[in-house]
Curated annotation (Swiss-Prot):
The chain crosses the membrane at residues 487-507, 525-545, 564-584, 591-611, 655-675, 707-727, 728-748, 1329-1349, 1386-1406, 1473-1493, 1497-1517, 1588-1608, 1630-1650, 1666-1686, 1701-1721, 1766-1786, 1826-1846. It comes from Aspergillus niger (strain ATCC MYA-4892 / CBS 513.88 / FGSC A1513). Residues 1-106 are annotated as: Disordered. GO terms for molecular function: 1,3-beta-D-glucan synthase activity. The gene is fksA. GO terms for cellular component: 1,3-beta-D-glucan synthase complex; mitochondrion; plasma membrane. Its EC number is 2.4.1.34. This is 1,3-beta-glucan synthase component FKS1. It comes from the Eukaryota. Pfam families: FKS1_dom1 (PF14288), FKS1_dom2 (PF23605), Glucan_synthase (PF02364). InterPro entries: FKS1-like_dom1, FKS1-like_dom2, Glyco_trans_48_dom. It is a multi-pass membrane protein.
Length: 1897
């Protein structure tokens, strides 16, 4: 009994010898609750309606009162749960363990009624402690378990929160206590009393070795659930339904697993006698041995035979299961629930493996019922379960991803395919073949041990042998072939059918344009019929890919050989007729061929439809078949999709019929028919005359038209894919709008009279009035709710006092003498009338938005609310890592960023002027009251003037006195308008206020009962709110917070004592060399403050190790999920908000789960087939993005979220396609926690953790709904960088999802309409972005090939009225006009595809806010260039997915939540966006430049805009980018950024950027020198060689081919009449231009290396910058060489501009390919430090040890690539800066630019920063210096560009015809014949040049 002073604990509860437990009181023992002090002061009836000064203020909820301590809680319902050190915790001796006394001293006699110290109080309201006890310190302290258990009689000790055991209530004869779980009160009705439940828990702890704290936590968890259910049904029904949900019901995961894994057969006949499927050799041997053993034991055999004689079908097993469940006693049901919860509550990472927990529970349950367990006397040691069962599994998980290096855990360099993740481990338990793999060191199997003995043997299992990969998440594009095979089938099949029919020239022998001869009819049919073979080929590829990803050894893998055989047969059937028609048409008659062709076509059509509709998993004998038990696990866990019924099903069919109907019609007429003429023209076209290129055969030149045609068809195919997404967006939007009218959420349904009927609707829809005992007039009840809403808005400073007066219900004298009546505000009537809009609240204000949405939403259909007493309990769960809790004064009123021009407070005042005004008035009233209280005299007239001046500080910073209570008000005002945790918590605590308000309004008898005692009334309301609503923040870093964070958290806890905080507590290792011990701990505002400023935790549960193994967020949620309470969880991010009027609807929202009413039928009645209703797993809610309207970027981000979270969610939920639980969704607690938790957590793979919860829910049979009448606020990113970080995170996360098994299950098993909904809502969006960017690139490639063709040919005179058989004039011309028309159509298509993203936003605004709001918002968007941002975002998305699928490296990117007002330096922006966008944009712009000079058409203007967007968006959306001074200061920074980092290391430098972009391919060396470098770098594993090969070698090589071919063609000298002309040597020319710089750079590098080695060490002593100077010279030479080579190209092309541009495009592609080749194939891994780079320039290699031998060679190759890249970056950076010059020269451009970015009027603009004199002078000097440099560079660049053009026009040329290097200008080549002679001349071509065009015109 050490540690407990004797005599303190008698008879199981403790006496307070020291006059009470002071921490529940303040020092003076005064009253705990002062109604004027707390935020809910409007519950005080006396002052309720008096809104004139005084009472109504409540100061923002009363938290500003600095003296507001946590002693406010007078009601003692809250148990601390740990008053003294717990039993064995910090190394106490064994004797201290409570288990010793507990187990042996059980005495049933202590249960007599006269000793009911634990207060089974009755349900009346008079059970508060008598006032005689108040203030005396009898504080109802309830000792924690570790103390209670020493009590002599009652030994339980687990009744965790006994909320309120004051002496007055607990002593016999005194008033009864308030129950913690009132609905589970101990009257005769409960099947098991809570004391018995407690005993069950203690018994289980002693038998299995669970932790005490975990037991107390889970006891509270179970009791809260029972209480929650029993409040709306009988206790017996509550227990039964809970048991059915967890263990035995049709929807219980445990029951489904039990039958899926054939454990009914194991229980019946044993594993040895089961017929099992495939297994490896080792397992087969083990099976044989087990069978032999069974045969040796004849008694067992008889039993087995007896059992086998019985019926082992699934039906019989289900019957046996139900009867077993039916016979179970309530006590046994509770025991099973308790055991399951205890297993789950300590399972750490194993909670991600639901079937593994089921297995553990099954073993434990079998063991419990065994004689061995029942006869145990000694309790099992605490922590046994954790250490023996969970920790080995945890360690296996952790070791998959981490290894120990120097005593620290370091991430292994493994990609997902090598990591056995949570899902692989979990899937071992799906099939009996998996379970039988579980064996011990001695190779015996766990399944050969009798079930009852398995638990004790579980600790000896060798898990390493058991687990294996069940799905390979190989990083590859081939996943898409398998997962989305039906998308390829539908699109490629339809495209083939359309195109083949319209391309007869491709299969017409000797086609002649003047004859327009057609192919035979059979060929028409058969050519189209080949589409069936194409579709079959896709399916064959999909099956082969599936073979790669699903290991054959997994029992759930489908048999693919049979399917493959079938598919090959189908392929042959679809191919053979075509081969006959085309190959044997000479042998067979045309009639037979025609019949074969027609049959071929219909076979193809049938194949196409069959493969389009049938899921891949359902082909030819699938495991989707319902009969047979072999694959029941895969059906259960991956294909239990809830069926769509009725309207939903028809809506789903309707949507997709509309989408594809419209798509196919439009694609046929717009895309296919527009390609018909180009195909007819280009396919037979031959180049007539062609001198060709040296070393290259002439056939290339002649085939240019066919190459172009191939590229055009590919381009058409990409547009064909894009069309589908376009129509999906349009149709989805139409369906969504139709549904919004149906629900009444649109403002275009005025017949609903949303305002005039609002009071009636509040009465009928928000209040549960049917069960009210005392009936009041509706107006009395409505007025209380309405006034509460208005006052809450007033408190939040949204409404001024005069607005409030107009909006409140007022008491006025009535006609009857002495009576008073309520007068309703005129608002309800006049608000419908548009002319009165501004009378009640400021136009366009937050208050208007909130009231309008509230009125609108209660007009929609809502479930009827239950009374508060009967509503279910729910928890709000908020994960928090490092987000701002509360803004500090320093952050608000000083400019933090060196580049920012505004303080946060200034900016917020600009954004919310009206709210700031209300706040200031409020503060002044408060200050005046304070000064009057302090006895200051009244002011006279003269003082009034002075006070105006004195009030200035209020308007500037919100306070005049620096007293904390005033500064805190300003901090809170700002925090409530930024994205802070404080805003989130204060918003979601409105649930508590709403519940109290509803309870008070609906139960007037409660108010009457307490008479005038508002303190007791408030206590009763608090009790109810606390019982029904919990809020828990998971602050994993809480224990490591700094002082400021700790203070802010403490402030939160004092403001909201019911706020629970779960955090990770760390203890140093007990022994040297061990790991530190980690605990999940929980505190709240009632917990005792310790001396170190921390609070004493209520629960502290030890973990197996560090739980943060993944990307953080999901692990953070997982460790705190054990502290959720009740039936539902609302998952919230730390940047959200909620409002009182929304919280009032919570009962209707929870009713959407369809669990509030249950039939009184037992789910366990055997023989009766219960109709399994699919449970609702997730309920989505709307989001209002409160960061909209803070400028263009914030608004774009907000509009995206709004349309996705509301507009699309509305239809997707309806048609079963919604997966996301975007936050603020509600989750079904039991459903989700028994199926792997609320998110997944494998590092990298589950980066977008929340969507996996949605996919799991869908696959496992849960429905996902969307609720239209409830919305929370949410913040979004506001700055360019943070929005794109978020975009990158989503994009890379999507790349990871493509690899995931969930996509495989959904893609290969969903029915067609559901599959399409899933595809287009999730992966389709990202693939669409990739197709958009692919189409842009393809279009540019088509344009350069077309440009080359047009440049070298003469275009025919075109007349669209003439028939196509008319001869072309002039003869041998090229008929390119239809091709130019096709180009224009493509531009239109791509343009529409980009702009379709604005349609949902426009429609959303139109339906919900009206035409004017839509017009203004869109006008603002377009006026702010948001379309350029859209193009850029599209590229970032596409790049993120592409990079991730190639290289991986997905990681959580923390996104900024702050306001983006700071200017970011050019160098930083360039390095961040060069790789993803600027490089690609500049390559495409070069191509566009060539196209513009050869095939100009006005439609290309759109491409100039969109491609410029890819390059300049980062700078265009950078605040103050065009401020004159800042621009040149920035230029200075850019020059420094380029040059630094070569003599000493610098993180922000060009060389650091260059090395970082290399490491993707090379990876880092594993040797960690000293401290591992930044987190970002360590997580990047080296990409797989095959991935590097395809994306870094093959892709650039293709780029070389598609740019080199047109370059060689344009230099082929076509149209030469003279046959003796020599071919030009374009190959050597391009080689000189491409390889020249590389050679020079290599020479320079080698030479400088020698210089550095010889001179570096000597010069380094005196000249510190020797290395930097050497590097600068080398880099300068590289730049000069690049500029020289540009001129050389110009010169060698005889000053021809188009040829030079195309030559540079081609040379750049070749150089890029060479550099990628060097980096991919020749470079070894990179060091994390950059010593070798510095050594190269300084010659100091001796620091590098042995590496100084290997590194110089590697560094030489690096330098070759670096110099090449540097020269490109230097030139490109300057060009970008020059492009900004025109904008820079516009007067007042900075003001205009800021208007665009921040949407602030020029009058409210942000002032320029103020500098000291010294700073100003320095800045001016720098500006002058660097402006001179900038303009010098500009002039130099212009000279280099213009000089050659002048030389050409002047006719200056040098005939330098060595090796025919010079390209003749060939301006006069023309071999067309103007006069037409003869007929049937072959169509030929000749070269055309600008001058030739004029000649031939």
């Amino acid at each position: 009994m050490s540690g407990y002073p004797a005599g303190h604990y008698e008879d199981g509860y403790g006496h307070q010898e020291h006059g009470g437990d002071a921490y529940y009181q303040d020092e003076h023992g005064q009253a705990y609750y002062d109604p004027n002090d707390y935020g809910d002061s409007y519950y005080d009836r006396g002052n309720y309606y008096n809104a004139e000064g005084g009472q109504a203020y409540g100061q923002e909820g009363g938290y500003y009162d600095a003296g507001h301590q946590d002693d406010y809680y007078g009601d003692q319902y809250y148990d601390q749960g740990n008053g003294a050190p717990r039993g064995r915790r910090r190394g106490d001796s064994e004797e201290d363990s409570e288990t010793f006394s507990d187990f042996t001293m059980r005495s049933e006699t202590a249960r007599a009624a006269d000793m009911d110290y634990y207060g089974r109080g009755d349900e009346r309201y008079n059970s508060y402690a008598d006032s005689q006890y108040a203030g005396r310190g009898y504080n109802g302290y309830r000792p924690p378990s570790s103390q209670v258990s020493y009590g002599a009689n009652r030994s339980s000790g687990a009744s965790t929160p006994v909320y309120g055991m004051d002496y007055g209530s607990a002593l016999p004869g005194g008033p009864r206590s308030r129950e913690p779980y009132p609905a589970w009160a101990s009257d005769g009705q409960v099947p098991v009393s809570k004391e018995e439940i407690e005993d069950i828990f203690i018994d289980l702890v002693n038998k299995f070795g669970f932790q005490r704290d975990s037991m107390r936590n889970m006891y509270d968890h179970l009791m809260t659930q029972l209480d929650s259910r029993a409040s709306r049904m009988t206790p017996n029904q509550a227990l039964l339904s809970l048991h059915a949900d967890y263990i035995g019901g049709d929807n219980a995961n445990y029951r489904r697993w039990y039958f899926a894994a054939h454990l009914d057969l194991d229980d019946a006949v044993g594993f040895a006698n089961m017929k099992l499927g495939k297994a490896d050799r080792k397992t087969r041997k083990a099976r044989k041995a087990a069978k032999a053993a069974a045969q040796q034991n004849p008694e067992n055999v008889e039993e087995n035979l007896e059992a086998m004689e019985g019926d082992n079908s699934l039906e019989a097993a289900v019957y046996r299961w139900k009867s077993r469940m039916n016979r179970m006693s309530p006590h046994d049901r509770v025991r099973q629930l308790a055991l399951y919860m205890l297993c789950w509550g300590e399972a750490n990472q194993v909670r991600y493996m639901p079937e593994c927990i089921c297995f553990i529970f099954k073993c434990a349950d079998d063991y419990y019922s065994s004689p061995e367990c029942q006869s145990r006397v000694e309790p099992v040691e605490e922590f046994t379960y954790l250490n023996e069962i969970i920790t080995p599994l945890y360690q296996f998980c952790r070791d998959q991803g981490y290894e120990i290096l120097d005593g620290k855990y370091v991430r292994r360099e493994r990609d997902h395919e090598k990591i056995i993740g949570y899902d692989d481990m979990n899937q071992l338990f799906w099939y009996p073949e998996g379970i039988e793999r579980i064996s011990f060191e001695d190779k015996t199997r766990l399944v050969d041990v009798p079930p009852a003995e398995r638990w004790t043997k579980l600790k000896d299992v060798d898990w390493k042998k058991a687990f294996f990969k069940t799905y390979r998440e190989t990083r590859s594009w081939f996943h898409m072939i398998t997962n989305f095979n039906r998308i390829w089938v539908i699109h490629l099949g339809a495209f083939w059918f359309f195109t083949a029919y319209n391309a007869p020239t491709l299969y017409t022998k000797n086609y002649q344009q003047q004859l327009d001869n057609k192919p035979a009819g059979s060929k028409y049919w058969s050519a189209v019929g080949f589409g069936g073979a194409l579709v079959g080929l896709i399916q064959i590829l999909a099956t082969l890919c599936e073979w790669m990803y699903v290991p054959r050894r997994w029992a759930g893998a489908q048999h693919l050989s049979k399917r493959l055989m079938f598919l090959i047969a189908v392929f042959i059937v679809n191919l053979a007729p075509g081969v006959v028609v085309f190959g044997f048409n000479n042998v067979l008659s045309e009639t037979i061929c025609l019949i074969i062709g027609i049959v071929h076509f219909f076979i193809a059509l049938a194949t196409f439809f069959f493969f389009s509709v049938m899921p891949l998993g359902g082909l030819f004998g699938s495991y989707l078949k319902k009969h047979g038990r072999q694959y029941v696990a895969s059906q259960t866990f991956t294909a239990s999709y809830p069926r769509l019924n009725g309207n939903d099903m028809w809506m789903s069919y309707g949507l997709w019929i509309c989408v594809f109907g419209a798509k196919l019609v439009e694609s046929y007429f717009f895309l296919t028919l527009s390609l018909k003429d180009p195909m007819r023209i280009l396919s037979p076209m031959r180049i007539h005359q062609c001198a060709g290129v040296t070393y290259i055969p002439n056939s290339l030149c002649h085939a240019q038209p066919q190459i172009l045609l191939g590229l055009m068809m590919f381009m058409d195919l990409t547009l064909f894919f894009l069309d589908s997404y376009l129509w999906y967006v349009i149709c989805n939007t139409i369906f969504s709008v139709a549904r919004s009218f149906y629900l009444g959420v649109s403002i275009w349904s005025p017949w609903r009279n949303i305002f005039s009927r609002l009071p009636k609707r509040i009465y009928s829809k928000v209040l549960a009035t049917t069960d009210m005992e005392i009936k009041y007039k509706p107006k009395v009840l409505i007025s209380q709710v309405w006034n509460a809403i208005i006052i809450s808005m007033y408190r939040e400073h949204l409404l001024a006092i005069d607005h409030v007066q107009k909006l409140l219900y007022h008491q006025v004298p009535s006609e009857q003498e002495g009576k008073r009546t309520l007068r309703a505000p005129t608002f309800f009537v006049s608000q419908e009338d548009q002319s009165f809009k501004t009378e009640f609240f400021p136009a366009g204000s937050e208050a208007e938005r909130r009231i309008s949405f509230f009125a609108q939403s209660v007009a929609t259909p809502m479930p009827e609310p239950l009374p508060v007493d009967n509503m279910p309990t729910f928890t709000v769960l908020i994960p928090h890592y490092g987000e701002k809790i509360l803004l500090s004064l320093r952050e608000i009123i000083r400019e933090d960023e060196p580049y920012s021009r505004v303080t946060l407070l200034e900016y917020l005042k600009q954004l919310h002027p009206h709210e700031w005004d209300c706040f200031v008035k409020d503060t002044k009233i408060l200050a005046d009251e304070t000064s009057q209280l302090n006895g200051e005299p009244e002011k006279n007239e003269k003082d009034a003037q002075k006070s105006k001046i004195d009030d200035l500080p209020f308007y500037c910073i919100g306070f005049k006195s620096a007293a904390p209570e005033y500064t805190l008000r300003t901090r809170i005002w700002s925090s409530l308008r930024s994205q802070t945790l404080y805003r989130t918590i204060s918003g979601f605590m409105n649930y508590s206020r709403a519940i109290k308000l509803l309870y008070r309004v609906e139960n007037p008898e409660v108010v009457q009962m307490f008479g005038g005692n508002s303190e007791k009334l408030e206590r009763e309301l608090e009790r109810m709110a606390r019982r029904k609503f919990k809020i828990c923040v998971s602050m994993q870093r809480y224990a490591k917070f700094n002082k400021e964070e700790r203070e802010n958290t403490e402030f939160l806890l004092r403001a909201y004592p019911d706020l629970q905080i779960a955090y990770l507590d760390e203890e140093p290792p007990a022994n040297e060399g061990e790991e530190p011990r980690l605990y999940s701990a929980l505190i709240d505002g009632h917990c005792e403050l310790l001396d170190n400023g921390m609070r004493k935790p209520k629960f502290r549960i030890q973990l197996s190790g560090n739980p943060i193994l993944g990307d953080g967020k999901s692990d953070n949620q997982n460790h705190s999920i054990i502290f959720y309470r009740g039936e539902y969880i609302q998952v919230i991010d730390a940047n959200q908000d909620n409002y009182l009027e929304e919280c009032l609807k919570i009962r209707s929202v929870l009713a959407e789960f369809e669990e509030l009413t249950t039939d009184n039928v037992s789910p366990y009645t055997p023989g009766i087939a219960t109709e399994a209703e699919t449970p609702v797993a997730i309920l989505g809610a709307r989001e209002y993005i409160f960061s909209e309207n803070v400028g263009v970027l914030g608004d774009v981000a907000a509009s995206k979220e709004q349309t996705f979270g509301t507009l699309f969610a509305r239809t997707l939920a309806q048609i079963g396609g919604k997966l996301h639980y975007g936050h603020p969704d509600f989750l079904n607690g039991i459903f989700m926690t028994t199926r792997g938790g609320i998110s997944k957590a494998q590092k990298g793979l589950h980066l977008n953790e929340d969507i996996y919860a949605g996919m799991t829910a869908l696959c496992r049979g849960g429905r996902i709904k969307h609720c239209e009448y409830f919305q929370c606020g949410k913040g979004r990113d506001l700055g360019f960088g943070s929005i794109l970080n978020f975009t990158t995170k989503i994009g890379t996360g999507m790349g990871e999802q493509m690899l995931s098994r969930e996509y495989y299950y959904l893609g290969t098993q969903l029915p067609l309409d559901r599959f399409l909904s899933f595809y287009y809502a999730h992966p389709g969006f990202h693939l669409n972005n990739m197709f958009i960017m692919l189409s842009v690139q393809m279009f540019m490639i088509v344009l350069i090939n077309l440009g080359a063709l047009k440049h070298e040919t003469i275009t025919c005179r075109y007349n669209s009225n003439l028939p196509i058989t008319d001869p072309l004039r002039p003869t041998y011309c090229a008929d390119l006009t239809p091709i130019i028309a096709w180009v224009n159509r493509c531009v239109v298509s791509i343009f529409i595809v980009f702009f379709i993203s604005f349609v949902p936003l426009a429609v959303q605004e139109l339906t919900e806010r009206g035409l004017w709001r839509m017009a203004t918002r869109l006008a603002k968007h377009f006026g702010s260039f948001s379309f350029m941002f859209e193009v850029f975002v599209c590229q970032i998305y596409a790049n993120a997915v592409h990079q991730n699928l190639s290289f991986g490296g997905a990681r959580y990117i923390g996104t900024g939540r702050g306001f983006a007002t700071a200017r970011i330096p050019f160098g930083v922006l360039y390095s961040r966006f060069a790789g993803p966008s600027i490089y690609a944009g500049s390559r495409l712009l070069l191509m566009l430049l060539f196209a513009t000079s050869t095939v100009w058409t006005p439609a290309l203007i759109w491409f100039w805009v969109s491609l410029l967007a890819l390059c300049i968006s980062p700078f265009l959306f950078n605040p103050h980018q065009f401020a004159w001074h800042d621009f040149f200061i920035d230029y200075r920074d850019y020059i420094r950024w380029l040059s630094r980092g070569n003599s000493r290391s610098h993180a922000s430098s060009w060389i650091a950027f260059c090395r970082l972009s290399r490491t993707r391919l090379t990876g880092y060396k594993r040797k960690l020198l000293g401290v591992p470098s930044e987190k970002g770098s360590g997580d990047v594993p080296r990409a797989k060689f095959t991935n590097i090969f395809f994306s870094e070698i093959i892709a650039p090589l293709v780029q070389v081919a598609v740019t080199l071919v047109p370059y060689l063609y344009i230099n082929s000298r076509t149209g030469i009449s003279n046959d003796n002309e020599r071919a030009s040597n374009a190959v050597v020319r391009i080689a000189i231009v491409a390889f020249g710089p590389i050679g020079v750079n290599a020479g320079v590098s080698g030479m400088f290396f020698g210089m550095a080695c010889c001179m570096g060490p000597i010069f380094g002593m005196c000249c510190k910058k020797f290395g930097a100077v050497l590097a600068a010279i080398a880099h300068a030479i590289a730049v000069i060489i690049l500029l020289v080579i540009f001129e050389v190209m110009f010169f060698l092309e005889s000053w021809s501009w188009p040829r030079m541009v195309l030559g540079m495009i081609s040379a750049a592609a070749i150089q890029r390919f060479i550099y990628k080749l060097i980096i991919s194939l020749a470079l070894t891994r990179e060091f994390k430090h950059d010593q070798s780079n510095i050594a190269w320039w300084t010659g100091k290699w001796y620091n590098m040890g042995w590496h100084s031998l290997s590194q110089p060679g590697r560094e030489f190759l690096c330098k070759i690539t670096e110099l090449g890249y540097f020269s490109a970056d230097f030139v490109l950076g300057h060009i970008l800066l020059f492009v900004m010059l025109p904008a820079l020269c516009i007067p007042y451009v900075d003001k205009f630019h800021s208007v665009i970015l921040f949407w602030l009027r020029p009058s409210r603009q942000i002032r320029p920063p103020i500098y000291s004199l010294k700073q100003s002078k320095l800045r001016k000097r720098r500006v002058v210096r660097f402006a001179i440099l900038y303009f010098t560079m500009l002039v130099l660049f212009l000279i280099l560009l213009i000089a050659p053009l002048v030389a050409r026009d002047e006719g200056i040329s040098v005939n330098l015809n060595i090796m025919s290097l010079m390209q003749p200008l060939d301006t006069d080549n023309n071999d067309t014949i103007s006069s037409y002679t003869g007929n049937g001349l072959p169509v030929g071509y000749s070269a055309w040049t600008p001058s030739a065009a004029s000649a031939s015109a």
